[in-house]
Amino acid sequence: MQLKGSKTHQALKDAFAGESQANRRYLYFAAKADVEGQNDIAAVFRSTAEGETGHAHGHLEYLESCGDPATNLPFGKSRDNLKSAIAGETHEYTDMYPGMAKTARAEGFAEIADWFETLAKAERSHANRFQKALDVLAD
Protein backbone atom coordinates (compact mmCIF):
# COMPACT_ATOMS: atom_id res chain seq x y z
CA MET A 1 0.00 0.00 0.00
CA GLN A 2 1.17 3.52 -0.78
CA LEU A 3 1.69 5.88 2.19
CA LYS A 4 0.53 9.02 0.35
CA GLY A 5 -3.20 9.44 0.81
CA SER A 6 -3.49 6.77 3.49
CA LYS A 7 -4.84 7.20 7.01
CA THR A 8 -1.28 6.72 8.24
CA HIS A 9 -0.16 9.62 6.05
CA GLN A 10 -2.78 11.83 7.70
CA ALA A 11 -1.76 10.53 11.12
CA LEU A 12 1.86 11.51 10.42
CA LYS A 13 0.76 14.98 9.31
CA ASP A 14 -1.39 15.39 12.43
CA ALA A 15 1.39 14.11 14.67
CA PHE A 16 3.90 16.45 13.04
CA ALA A 17 1.58 19.42 13.63
CA GLY A 18 1.01 18.43 17.25
CA GLU A 19 4.71 17.92 18.02
CA SER A 20 5.61 21.18 16.27
CA GLN A 21 3.02 23.11 18.25
CA ALA A 22 4.16 21.47 21.49
CA ASN A 23 7.74 22.57 20.75
CA ARG A 24 6.74 26.20 20.26
CA ARG A 25 4.39 26.20 23.26
CA TYR A 26 7.07 24.76 25.52
CA LEU A 27 9.61 27.34 24.38
CA TYR A 28 7.03 30.05 25.11
CA PHE A 29 6.39 28.51 28.54
CA ALA A 30 10.16 28.43 29.17
CA ALA A 31 10.43 32.14 28.40
CA LYS A 32 7.58 32.84 30.83
CA ALA A 33 9.31 30.75 33.49
CA ASP A 34 12.52 32.73 32.89
CA VAL A 35 10.65 35.99 33.51
CA GLU A 36 9.29 34.53 36.75
CA GLY A 37 12.80 33.50 37.82
CA GLN A 38 11.89 29.81 37.60
CA ASN A 39 15.12 28.66 35.95
CA ASP A 40 14.62 24.96 36.72
CA ILE A 41 11.11 25.02 35.24
CA ALA A 42 12.41 26.85 32.16
CA ALA A 43 15.08 24.18 31.71
CA VAL A 44 12.47 21.41 31.88
CA PHE A 45 10.37 23.13 29.23
CA ARG A 46 13.40 23.71 26.97
CA SER A 47 14.67 20.15 27.19
CA THR A 48 11.20 18.77 26.54
CA ALA A 49 10.80 21.14 23.58
CA GLU A 50 14.00 19.69 22.13
CA GLY A 51 12.55 16.19 22.49
CA GLU A 52 9.40 17.30 20.67
CA THR A 53 11.62 18.62 17.87
CA GLY A 54 13.13 15.16 17.52
CA HIS A 55 9.67 13.64 17.30
CA ALA A 56 8.60 16.17 14.65
CA HIS A 57 11.73 15.51 12.61
CA GLY A 58 11.03 11.78 12.78
CA HIS A 59 7.57 12.37 11.33
CA LEU A 60 9.08 14.50 8.56
CA GLU A 61 11.47 11.69 7.64
CA TYR A 62 8.47 9.49 6.86
CA LEU A 63 6.62 12.34 5.16
CA GLU A 64 9.44 13.07 2.69
CA SER A 65 8.01 10.47 0.32
CA CYS A 66 4.61 12.22 0.39
CA GLY A 67 5.48 15.91 0.20
CA ASP A 68 5.68 18.78 2.64
CA PRO A 69 2.75 18.54 5.07
CA ALA A 70 2.17 22.30 4.74
CA THR A 71 2.45 22.73 0.97
CA ASN A 72 2.27 19.20 -0.49
CA LEU A 73 5.37 20.06 -2.51
CA PRO A 74 8.44 17.82 -2.63
CA PHE A 75 11.00 18.41 0.11
CA GLY A 76 14.22 16.96 1.41
CA LYS A 77 16.88 18.58 -0.78
CA SER A 78 17.73 22.26 -0.39
CA ARG A 79 16.25 23.31 -3.75
CA ASP A 80 12.96 21.56 -2.98
CA ASN A 81 12.99 22.85 0.60
CA LEU A 82 13.40 26.43 -0.61
CA LYS A 83 10.60 26.06 -3.17
CA SER A 84 8.29 24.63 -0.52
CA ALA A 85 9.23 27.37 1.96
CA ILE A 86 8.53 30.05 -0.67
CA ALA A 87 5.13 28.52 -1.39
CA GLY A 88 4.27 28.37 2.31
CA GLU A 89 5.36 31.92 3.07
CA THR A 90 3.61 33.20 -0.08
CA HIS A 91 0.36 31.58 1.02
CA GLU A 92 0.73 33.20 4.44
CA TYR A 93 1.27 36.72 3.11
CA THR A 94 -1.18 36.60 0.19
CA ASP A 95 -4.08 34.58 1.60
CA MET A 96 -3.83 33.44 5.18
CA TYR A 97 -2.91 36.57 7.13
CA PRO A 98 -4.88 39.03 4.97
CA GLY A 99 -7.97 36.83 5.40
CA MET A 100 -7.41 36.56 9.13
CA ALA A 101 -6.91 40.32 9.40
CA LYS A 102 -10.14 40.97 7.52
CA THR A 103 -12.07 38.64 9.82
CA ALA A 104 -10.51 40.07 12.98
CA ARG A 105 -11.27 43.62 11.87
CA ALA A 106 -14.88 42.70 10.99
CA GLU A 107 -15.29 41.18 14.45
CA GLY A 108 -13.95 44.32 16.12
CA PHE A 109 -10.47 43.05 16.98
CA ALA A 110 -8.49 45.88 15.39
CA GLU A 111 -5.31 45.23 17.37
CA ILE A 112 -5.28 41.58 16.32
CA ALA A 113 -6.03 42.59 12.72
CA ASP A 114 -3.05 44.94 12.82
CA TRP A 115 -0.91 42.09 14.21
CA PHE A 116 -1.97 39.80 11.35
CA GLU A 117 -1.18 42.54 8.82
CA THR A 118 2.26 43.01 10.36
CA LEU A 119 2.87 39.28 10.11
CA ALA A 120 1.84 39.27 6.45
CA LYS A 121 4.62 41.79 5.78
CA ALA A 122 7.11 39.64 7.67
CA GLU A 123 6.07 36.53 5.73
CA ARG A 124 6.57 38.40 2.45
CA SER A 125 10.09 39.25 3.60
CA HIS A 126 10.68 35.59 4.46
CA ALA A 127 9.49 34.49 1.01
CA ASN A 128 11.82 37.02 -0.61
CA ARG A 129 14.78 35.80 1.47
CA PHE A 130 14.09 32.21 0.47
CA GLN A 131 13.74 33.26 -3.18
CA LYS A 132 17.11 35.03 -3.08
CA ALA A 133 18.68 31.91 -1.59
CA LEU A 134 17.09 29.77 -4.31
CA ASP A 135 18.30 32.15 -7.02
CA VAL A 136 21.93 31.70 -5.98
CA LEU A 137 21.76 28.02 -5.01
CA ALA A 138 24.42 25.99 -6.77
CA ASP A 139 23.43 22.52 -7.93
Predicted features along the sequence, with ranges:
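Non-heme di-metal
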Residues: 1-139
